[in-house]
Structure formats: structure tokens, C-alpha cells
Amino acid sequence: PAHVRKNAAAQVGDVLILTKGLGIGVMSAAFKKQQLSQADYAVMIQSTTQLNRPGSLLAKMDGVHALTDVTGFGLLGHAWEIARGSKVKIELDFAALPWLPNVPELASQGFITGASGRNWQAYGEHIQLAETVTATQRGMLTDPQTSGGLLISCRPDVAPSVLTLLHEQGFDYACQIGHVTAGSGVQVK
């Protein structure tokens, strides 16, 4: 119990780290229409079969405050869960988000799942998108993930150690994607 990390303990000043690339729903939609290359299919399978084993190690690290897995509600939905539960605002940097190969191109070709739209309807009122975020990009942000990565809220001084651990464990897409501020909801810049 001393090492349990919930999705409701993010603190103002924390940085946000994502462990896996995004876009599994987009890739799955393309696969169903036989429009996903063999190389991209291999990446999709590798991502969905990579277990989130570092979660137990991260939970033991001082300065890691909150963890959640990004799954069916997409990145925005799970960021909203952290914001709501922690009574903070989550700010995400769209340019920093790690997309799996060709996901933006596939999404622009219309490979957005119906679940993505339903996700937006469920929580969109709590999300503030920059004017530069297109409807397609919004669909990518709400894209449901199968076996998605972990969204981690940690102190800035701990972030380099978190990223080193993740990269050593084979989480090549792991990167910082935003931070936690005072307020409420989720903002994408």
C-alpha cells in the first residue's frame, strides 16, 4: 500500500510523461480497411503487446505522484481523470506528443474510430483545445488505445530518472508531454 499510485494525486508543478506512442485506434481502423502497411502493423502489435511493467518500479520512486494507463478514453480522457481527481489543470503540448509511425497521415485520410467521437462527447466540455488543433487532431487526442502507455505525473527533478528508467526498459517513445498547473480541466496548446 505504501507504493500505490493513483490517478488522483497529481500536484501543481508536476510534469507529465507518457510511456508509449499514441494512435493504436487510428492504426486499427486502417488495418480493418486493409490500409495499414506491414511495417506499421508490426509497430502496432509491438506496442500493444509491450506490458507496462515499469509501473511497479515507478510507484516506488519518490516524486512520482500519479499514474494511470491510457486506454479506451484516449489521452484526453485519462488526462481529464487525473485533472478531475487531483483538482488540478493538465496542460498538454500537442507538438510534444509521441505518435506511432504514420498516425497523423492515416488520421488525415479518415481513419478515426467512432469511439473517438463518443469520447469527445463524453468529456469534451472539460477540454480546452488551442485554435490550431484541427478536428482530425482532436480525433487523434481522443483515440482509444488498446494496451496504451502510462501517463505519469511527477516532480520535475525526478523526470530525468523516470525517462531513463523507461528508455532502459525499452519504452522508446517515452517523453515529457505537459505539466500540471492550478485550475481545472485539460488544455492542449
Model features per residue range: what roles?
Residues L22-G23, N52, L67-G72:
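A structural signal for small-residue-enriched, beta-sheet-centric alpha/beta enzyme cores
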Residues P1-N7, T49-Q50, G74, D157:
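Residue-level recognition of alpha-helix initiation/capping sites
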Residues P1-A9, S56, W80-E81, G139-T142:
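A generic local secondary-structure boundary/capping motif
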Residues P1-A2, K32-M44, K87-E91, F111-I112, ...:
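Glycine-rich tight-turn/loop motif centered on a GG-T
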Residues P1-L36, G178-H179:
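Glycine-rich anion-binding loops of enzyme active sites
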Residues Q11-L16, K20, I24, A42, ...:
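Residues on a specific face of well-ordered alpha-helices
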Residues P1-H3, A39-K60, V133:
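Active-site glycine-rich loop that binds ribose-phosphate moieties when present
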Residues M61-K189:
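Glycine-/charge-enriched secondary-structure boundary and capping motifs
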